[in-house]
Amino acid sequence: ALTAQINPHFLYNSLSIINWMAIKSRQKEISRVTLALSTFYRTALSKGADMVTVENCIRNIEAYLEIQLIMHDNDFKVEWSVDSSVQQELVPKLALQPIVENALEHGLDVKEEGEKILRLSFFEEAGDVVIRVEDNGMGMEQAEKLLTYQAKGYGLKNVNDRMCILYGEDYAIRILSKVGQGTRVDMRIPKEVKKDET
C-alpha cells in the first residue's frame, strides 16, 4: 500500500519546516494549508491501522476541507452534525474522503447560482453508525449507477466495494440525488464491529 511506502517522519518534518518558513515570512495562508496538510496525512496514515475512530475520521475530513476551502476561495459552506455517542466507534480509514471529494467536484463546483452547502452528519440509527454527506449542488440522474462501474473521477465504486467486502451487501452505500437539488450519500457501519484499535 502507498501509506506503507511513505516515511511519515520525513513528511511531517518537511511540513513543519514549510510552516516555520511561512510563519517567519508572515504567510498565514501558506501556514494554514501546511498545518491542514500535516493533519490530513497524520490522520490518513493513522499508524497503519485499517480502522479509525469517527473522531479521527472527522479530523481527517476537517483538514481536507480546510485545504478545499482555501482552494475554492471559501465559496462553499460546511455544516456539521456529530452525535457524541458515535465518536469512538470504528469506521474504515479513508472511506469518507472520496465521497466528500465527489460532493465538491460533481455537486457544488458545477452549481452556478445560490449558496453552496456541504452537510456532514454522523449519528446512530438502528444499531449502525451512519455517515451522511449531503450537498445542495446540481444533483444527477441515475446516481446509483456510480456504485456499479468505475466512472472517471468518481471514487464511489471503490468505497462501496470496500464496504460490501467488510460488512456485506446490506451495508452498500446509498445514494439519493435529485437533478437541480443536490445529492445525499449514506454510509452505514455496524456499531459492534471492532477490527483494529487505533
What are these regions (language model features)?
Residues A1-L176, G182-R188, K194:
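Two-component histidine phosphotransfer core
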Residues D196-T198:
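Short, charged, solvent-exposed linker or helix-capping segments at domain edges/interfaces
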